[in-house]
């Protein structure tokens, strides 16, 4: 696809964010993480994703198996976007064979997203390791993973500018949610860099972006003070390729 040149070529101004989104700023790309959970309880902090349980990152890189809950999903292709054992970016397309496991050719250490690129699945799509642990899942009708989990690739730095969280609680229910940003270094050190209680929605735009180094695991999580809540989380920023001599 051909793109019109930047408006600055004609002596006019164009928003830097738009330039990045158009792919006209070398080494920069938009980072947009969205997660949704149908029920976040008061049991523990968990990310917003398709399972109402904690998300545990793989301990080793391994091939994954992809399947559907429906035997009729045989003409559906998904693209897995993840990282290898060196935290380098890798992608792989997999065509489903119904409920039969289809193995990836590459070993994944992290999975950042999975998106449908051909067809429309009628079942739930699962991406698991050989032991049956789910690392990504596409809900029926979504076409893409909705999980507030992301690992910064090697050779890149993430600059996060906006955090939004939404809950299904009502003002009169007495139940609130707590949002937090948990990040874990490649050496296993955990840091909570943001935590705040909220009712229906929480939003912050940072004039100075939150810097997240390469190889950092991120989980944007919520916890209910009482009954289970529907939770949506949005994180925006820019992924910048590190300068190398």
Model-derived features: where do they sit?
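Beta-strand-centric surfaces of beta-sandwich/beta-rich domains
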Residues: 2-110, 117-245
């Amino acid at each position: 696809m051909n793109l019109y040149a930047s408006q600055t070529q004609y002596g006019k101004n164009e928003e830097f964010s738009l330039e990045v989104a158009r792919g006209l700023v070398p080494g920069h790309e938009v980072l947009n993480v969205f997660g949704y959970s149908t029920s976040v309880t008061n049991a523990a902090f968990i990310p917003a994703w398709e399972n109402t349980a904690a998300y545990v990152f793989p301990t080793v890189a391994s091939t994954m198996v992809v399947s559907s809950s429906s035997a009729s999903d045989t003409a559906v292709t998904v693209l897995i976007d993840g990282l290898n054992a060196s935290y380098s970016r890798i992608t792989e397309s997999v065509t489903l064979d119904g409920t039969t496991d289809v193995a990836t050719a590459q070993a994944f250490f992290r999975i950042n997203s999975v998106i449908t690129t051909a067809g429309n699945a009628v079942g739930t799509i699962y991406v698991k390791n050989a032991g049956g642990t789910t690392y990504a899942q596409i809900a029926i009708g979504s076409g893409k993973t909705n999980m507030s989990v992301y690992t910064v690739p090697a050779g890149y730095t993430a600059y996060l500018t906006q955090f939004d969280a939404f809950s299904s609680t009502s003002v009169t229910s007495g139940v609130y949610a707590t949002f937090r940003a948990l990040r874990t270094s490649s050496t296993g050190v955990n840091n909570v860099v943001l935590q705040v209680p909220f009712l229906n929605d929480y939003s912050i735009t940072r004039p100075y972006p939150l810097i997240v180094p390469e190889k950092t695991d991120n989980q944007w999580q919520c916890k209910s003070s009482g009954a289970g809540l529907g939770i949506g989380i949005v994180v925006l920023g820019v992924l910048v390729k590190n300068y190398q001599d």
